[in-house]
Amino acid sequence: MNAKNNDSIVISVCTGTGGVATGGYKVIDAFKEELAKINSTAKIGPRTHKVGCRGFCAKDVLVDVDINGEIETYQHVTADKAREIVASHILGKEPVKKWLVKEDYHNFHDKQQKLVLADCGKINPESIDEYLAIGGYNSLKKSLSMEPEEIIDIIKKAGLRGRGGGGFPAGIKWESCRNAKGNPKYVLCNADEGDPGAFMDRSIVEGDPHLMLEGMIIGAFAIGSPEGYVYIRAEYPLAVDRLCLALDQARERGFLGENIFGSDFSFDIKIVLGAGAFVCGESTALMTSIEDKPGEPRPKYVHTTDKGLWGKPSNLNNVETWANVPMIIEKGADWYASIGTEKSKGTKIFSLVGKINNTGLVEVPMGITLREIIYDIGGGIPRKKEFKAVQTGGPSGGCLPASFLDKPVDYETLYEAGSMMGSGGMVVLDEDSCMVDVSRYFLDFCKDEGCGQCTPCREGVAHMVRILTQITEGKGSLAHIDLLEELAQMIQDTSLCALGTSAPNPVLSTLMYFRDEYKAHVVDKKCPAGVCRNLTTFVIDEDLCTGCTLCARNCPAGAIYGEKKEVHFIEQDKCTKCRVCYDSCKFEAVKKG
């Protein structure tokens, strides 16, 4: 990169999936077109390139303009804005202040500690030269001068735990696979994150694919594997394209293939496209899918490190776990272990979504509190609504109330609270979120995504969904609550795989912390959040209504009437409980009951 040349101009445009979806490629074309005009009359050497996701996806398209090392960041850039930025900022030396990022952008990043995402948004993910320029593949070269057992000891001492689910110590898993009988051994990467609203692994592959590949190659050398697989969902076309390009570049430079770095170590990686099945995130289901069989979990009487892919010892980690490896080799186990908590080392990437002002990816040290993530980084709840809960760990995670806001985020704390770290999904819920409906939604997802092999999961989860649906429709009873708990315990105790055993978590956690909300549904026949239509009535507060007519104009059912600047009323017979009036009223005059 030429960022520090005295006559250099470098324009970096976000082209992660979020950036592309909001016009990133059009922005690049506009910059190139305008800069080409400049080059015809001035020798200033401008350069425009793609970068990966910077995390604050709500601000896309994000653009850095670097003139002689002085960087200004713009948000919500369009092709038209790009042309004005060139005219004003690059030619006129005057940044377009109205489009620069605001304080919330800096607040979003200030409390983060970016290690895995350190170079996402800085380097071109399609250029291996830019990865090499920041020290890429140096850790691999260093590893090849070490003994495999030494590398495993470093990973164990660092305390790296799997970032894809249960948090099993990576070094112990590597050691088990290396010591297992049978060859060849396989190294696998799960890039198939199936949690709704999760995009951590996708962003790493899109923004810094060589980091993950370098980690896999180091792991393969330590384990003694000649062949690896990346299992990635076909619905990630941009990530797949950049991963394929990165693999080709790595082979061309000798980082993959025969005799890597002139050593006697040979290793290559193949890509397998997943069809988007959530159950294929389970390790044995993923492996059967790679074997070109239906993605169904197998009983784990024998660990996959002993008998995994094609019956051979196999080591599976997700993208984020592999991406941590190069920095541990480079900076040492003690450095890595100094970050985080006693039992949860390093950082964790979370997909922060839901009822939150600042939506995006955040990378924070283990042990940070939920309050810091949600309020300091996430900017709190929109419209000054009250925080109700945060759902962590994906569809089979748990919902934690406000009393947990000051608890540390680590594997043990979340597990003890009835939730889990999972792959890093974090959904924020506010006062307008119905916890019964949230439970029904996530359980319904697990029902649809189950493989159908075992009766407890197949029939038990489906029956729980039916009960929750009855409760949200006003047909529930107190006996249903007891039955939900009984079914949940049975499913946890007897299901075949982790998808089944963890599926009831949203229900159990909401029953633990929001039991009164369930009782309101079955006893009072009311939904306190105003979400369940059969249990909700909307009325207009005469003292707060200004007669602005906004609710009446937006009502799709024509159920609201009243003269301008006079109190309005809702005809209950016509009201469909769609919440449009409630959400659109600027004076909070529409009340739910």
Q: Model-flagged regions — what are they?
A:
Residues I123-P125, Y131-N138, V187-D201, T304-L309, ...:
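Gly-rich Lys/Arg/Thr-decorated short loops/hinges at beta-loop-alpha junctions or inter-strand turns
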Residues V240-M366, G378:
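Hydrophobic alpha-helical positions that pack around
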Residues G215-I217, G367-P382:
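Short amphipathic, charge-patterned alpha-helical segments
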Residues S344-N358, L370, P528-T576, V580:
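C-terminal accessory/binding modules appended to enzymatic or scaffolding proteins
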Residues G18-V20, G136, I155-C177, G276-T288, ...:
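Conserved phosphate/anionic-ligand binding catalytic regions in large, soluble enzymes, centered on
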Residues K59-V65, P456-A462, I540, L550-F569, ...:
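Iron-sulfur cluster-binding cysteine motifs and their immediate structural context
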Residues M1-V10, G24-H49, D66-G92, N138-K157, ...:
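Ferredoxin-type iron-sulfur electron-transfer modules in oxidoreductases and energy-metabolism complexes
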Residues K98-K157, G311, N317-G332:
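Flexible inter-domain linker/hinge segments
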